[in-house]
């Protein structure tokens, strides 16, 4: 197939407002050419400006972070369907705004026009611009020059290979061959067939051996294009239907099992153009010499610019003063011109200093905090369970919350937060999406402390509303000096999985029976420090209300609540010998009665074993065709629980399956209780602007003896499959944090640690970064929600595939429970290991990550293992009278 040649590009549009003459510069004048004033010192090299084409991948912002550091200025990110060729021609050739182009990885194949978008035409037309293609971008480079794209001998995702190369400048200062140390991470199912390379392309890198490496270098062994479009009309169609056959599969791609698995092609370059491609992922946290590759590409760019007469006149966009929010917001569709600006611009909020109240705007609040501390108190009264029961456990604990660090082993969590219906500022916010598509808005109901209810339609959705609510709050930092925790009052509740349509997903498969988000505004709360046993009592009031007389009233109400709560706690100290700390006891005398007919109810899994295994196989097929690297498949199990004591169930769950990010939430108006024993943090932002994610990928049951337990722990630690799962999600979370964190700040202090809990061992990693100052807490959540450990990667395509396989909505499961503090911090978990009680029904979600190494039968068993703890607790709470024989059930059940 000959190299493609496209029509002459159209004339450019008018200059964009962000590209002014003051932002342009020409290539530095030759020595001796004169110039402005000066001391004659060396001129620092100009930064390199990169256009980064995003193929809807979940690793693009890892490349963004690397290029920001290497180039000295962040790249401009544009999705592959966001610019037309007219736009590219304008900015690359007329405005001369970019020095080079990088084409990102992504799902699918370059043979499918909508998978690669504008990238193909860029590779065809931009012959005088240095271009680096990564993974899908690499395959696209081969495709436009006639190479065949075929299935790899084996789908490789999250695993490492040693490489050898030919000394090409892209690999300058990088060793080559077996045991050289040049190990790279691979995420791909398709490859360029080496024998199909035209004279235009030169092979520059290959796998050095057939041996695949896991991150810990486990020795476990590893268990074409027949249809290419020949016309421009077919090649550049944008209709998704053009990419599929009647059975919904991608166009035919040859099976490449006959290819040599030993020397898989890992890099190519063009013979005359400065175009390079690498099949592996240099941006991965586990790739060796990844940054060196980007540095070499920068050097290729600068050398090419000096050697090419055409580029001597190239005008390059300077580092200048571009809006940080435009460069680094989660949605970069607002970068270029006013007609492309996203309608929801970020509203920046200036921090309030500790010395004076800010000027008030309409609707603003200035919250002041009062607090008291009781030293070394927790152990004297039998633990945090007794505090919650006495202060908030009455009336079935209606409208209460408890962010419960019920597992504090190994300093995994330190603080618990609890509260109920509070003072004048308390309110409950309940949100339902209007439909299941993006940008649909939804209906919000607000109920205040006095019982008044207001209903509104939110055109821009719940997260936008929450962001504006937080922006309207001012505060005085000195109020919480001395407090060792970040939640000082504010919003506490959950975000359902369906709110993904406000975070880059295009749609939901079905409507959730539970609200899509539900939060309290908590103005009164009690905090427990599990490290030293201290207990804190906190209360908020609105300083701005003093102008109409309400401030003094609020202040007195909150002072009274502080005093009364302190008295109740001290009374508990005096009564400590008589307090029950048995999680099986009833709360405040509430009886626990279940009829025998209810006892006979059983959990029924939404899909049979055969159906679930078929779904796993479908996931493997999608992975093999390059549509995803990892798919987090889930299912739901349900049973009737009409008379279940929800709080009693939670107390039993926290005892049998303690977890650092456990939670209890009750929304009485919705007949909804959430009993969560999650071991996983989704995302946290502390007062030092540090973002942290702690994804879990990899789970195995505890052993019956210490010897068996240690054997199982090591089995998980060295599992190649689980390491691959974990690495993929770590790179995904690095990407999500990279959208909103300062360039160069995203790092991984803990990679693939094994943590042990009461019932399971899990593989956990920690990712951190420093939030950019002009982005809000909600911006950070929108950049990363839903948690990648519950979707897979690439996230957007993976969510679409999962929606097509999962037949019911996830609802609260896979979402997040936690807080948004009034002082602009937050901490959210991943909702797993959770029982949701709603309108007399208990539901539990469970699943697992499907990767190329997955075994369908093992995946089904892992799903059952993850559901075991919560289902066991529900069964125990409902079997005081009747204990059925589970072996005679005709339905798929969990016990």
UniProtKB/Swiss-Prot annotation:
Localization = Plastid, Chloroplast
Q: Which InterPro entries match?
A: ADC_synth_comp_1, ADC_synthase, Anth_synth_I-like, Anth_synth_I_N, Chorismate_C, Class_I_gatase-like, GATASE, TrpG/PapA_dom
Q: Which domain of life is it from?
A: Eukaryota
Xref: Gene3D superfamilies: 3.40.50.880, Anthranilate synthase (3.60.120.10)
Organism whose genome encodes this protein? Oryza sativa subsp. japonica
UniProt name for this protein: Probable aminodeoxychorismate synthase, chloroplastic
Q: Mind telling me where the transit peptide is? A: 1-48
Q: List membrane-spanning regions.
A: none
Domain writeup? The PABA component provides the glutamine amidotransferase activity. The PABB component catalyzes the formation of ADC by binding chorismate and ammonia.
The Glutamine amidotransferase type-1 domain sits at 49-307
Which parts of this chain are annotated as the region Disordered?
Answer: 1-45
- Please name the catalytic residues of this protein: 135 (nucleophile), 281, 283
> Where does this protein have compositionally biased stretches of type Gly residues?
32-42
What pathway is it annotated to? Cofactor biosynthesis; tetrahydrofolate biosynthesis; 4-aminobenzoate from chorismate: step 1/2; Antibiotic biosynthesis; candicidin biosynthesis
Q: Which family does it belong to?
A: In the C-terminal section; belongs to the anthranilate synthase component I family.
Q: What is this enzyme's EC?
A: 2.6.1.85
Reactions catalysed according to its record: chorismate + L-glutamine = 4-amino-4-deoxychorismate + L-glutamate
Q: What's this protein's function? A: Bifunctional enzyme that catalyzes the biosynthesis of 4-amino-4-deoxychorismate (ADC) from chorismate and glutamine. In the first step, a glutamine amidotransferase generates ammonia that is channelled between the binding sites of glutamine and chorismate and used along with chorismate in the second step, catalyzed by aminodeoxychorismate synthase, to produce ADC. Required for the synthesis of 4-aminobenzoate (PABA), an important component in tetrahydrofolate biosynthesis. Does not possess ADC lyase activity.
